[in-house]
Each structure stands twice: as structure tokens, then as C-alpha cells.
Amino acid sequence: MKSLFKVTLLATTMAVALHAPITFAAEAAKPATAADSKAAFKNDDQKSAYALGASLGRYMENSLKEQEKLGIKLDKDQLIAGVQDAFADKSKLSDQEIEQTLQAFEARVKSSAQAKMEKDAADNEAKGKEYREKFAKEKGVKTSSTGLVYQVVEAGKGEAPKDSDTVVVNYKGTLIDGKEFDNSYTRGEPLSFRLDGVIPGWTEGLKNIKKGGKIKLVIPPELAYGKAGVPGIPPNSTLVFDVELLDVKPAPKADAKPEADAKAADSAKK
């Protein structure tokens, strides 16, 4: 948090310094044309400076929006005034006051983020449980002892994959509200992985079908990404996957040559 916070302040400083008239308008600015760009800058140094300021300004604006989600709304006029005063060497705060204020603000952001994460985690856990219970009542749906809820759409043929096997799948992953977070179909490329190298819900679930099979997995958070979550997947999310098992590649058998060499050595001693 601390390193990010410093980058955020730098973004504000640079954005305002390089482009003083910057405003935080609600509406997006009209895209510049090639003619506008050529007329605005006398040389590459000016253009590069502006590009840096625009990039940092956008980053800072996004950072402020994220803080607003935590209930923290900074006064943008004061933010800009602070930067301008610093460049004019007319700061209204001493270095010590600045340091103390920023430390307190950092603690506030961290506390608010933790509180939001815990609230989101509790809400997602409750909604996920309700979703799983409802899905479990549908025809052909089973619930395992671990809490995995699944529906075999097509069983497939051959042997079911083992932990050490490599599987090739196509899949679509969504949250319980239908929001898609991953899709191999749209990427145009199936995913290949060792079965025991993914989230537990997948490792367990894919053993219920064979090559050519299809399955719907509704995975509780404890078999997915848990309370921590990952980018794109909030904490304590129940995940919904539609998976097609395209191929199963058995793990290579251990090389029998060392054993054969040992037997040959024993024979030679006799």
C-alpha cells in the first residue's frame, strides 16, 4: 500500500505540473485528431511531456475513483492546490505535517479497504450458498462431500482423468450473477494443464467425466479462491464453470531402464 500510495502522489504531481489546466470532468474529453496533435506541440519533448502527464492524470483519476468506492472522497481542488503550492515553494504544511497527514491517510485507506473486503466476503458467501442450494435441487445435479455441486451434461468415453494426468479443456467461467471472467472459447484456444495443478473444485469435478464429456461445476469459495479472491474474482465468490473435456493425456510411466540395469548387474555378479 505504501509504495502504491507514493506512486499515486507522484501521478498527481506530474499530471498537474505538466498540464496545469487539468480538470476532473465527469465527461470524457473529445479524442484529439492528428491535426490537433501536430498543432499543439512544437517538438517531441513537448509531446512526450504531455503524454506522460496525460497518462499519469488518467491513472490518478482512476485511483481517486477507487478510493471513492471505499467511502473516501478527496477534495480535488485542494489536491491540485497542494501540488501547485509545492511547485511554488509555498506549501501551507510543514514537511512533518505532510508526513503525519499522509501516514494517517494511508492507515485510513487500509482500514476502509479491509472493512469493505470483509463485508463483500460475507455478502458473497451468503449469496453463493443460496445459489448452490438452489442449483442442487435441479434435475441430475449432485453435491459431493466437499461441497462441490455439479451436473454431468455428457459423460464422455474412456477412463476418467487422474490427478497426474494432463487434460485439455474448453470452458466458460462466470460469477453467480452471470458476469464472465474467463472463456477459452472466445480466446479461440483450449487450456491444457495437469489436473492436480488447478483449484480443488476443478481437480475433483473433472474426475466425474471422461474424454468428450461435458460438466457444469458450481464451486464453493473454499474449493476455489477463498476469502482472498483474485483480480476479477471477489472474495468468497462461488464460481460457475461449463467445462468440455477435449482430451486426457496420461502421465508418462516411470522409466523402467534403471530397474532393468539393476537386474543385469545382479546377474553379472552371479
From Swiss-Prot:
It comes from Escherichia coli (strain K12). The gene is fkpA. GO terms for biological process: protein refolding. This is FKBP-type peptidyl-prolyl cis-trans isomerase FkpA. PPIases accelerate the folding of proteins. It catalyzes the cis-trans isomerization of proline imidic peptide bonds in oligopeptides. Keywords: Isomerase, Periplasm, Rotamase, Signal. It is found in: Periplasm. One of its GO terms (cellular component) is outer membrane-bounded periplasmic space. It holds the Pfam family FKBP_N. InterPro entries: PPIase_dom_sf, PPIase_FKBP_dom, PPIase_FKBP_N, PPIase_FKBP_N_sf. The keyword Signal applies. Residues 1-25 form the signal peptide. Its EC number is 5.2.1.8. It is an enzyme of class 5 (isomerase). Belongs to the FKBP-type PPIase family. The keyword NAD does not apply.
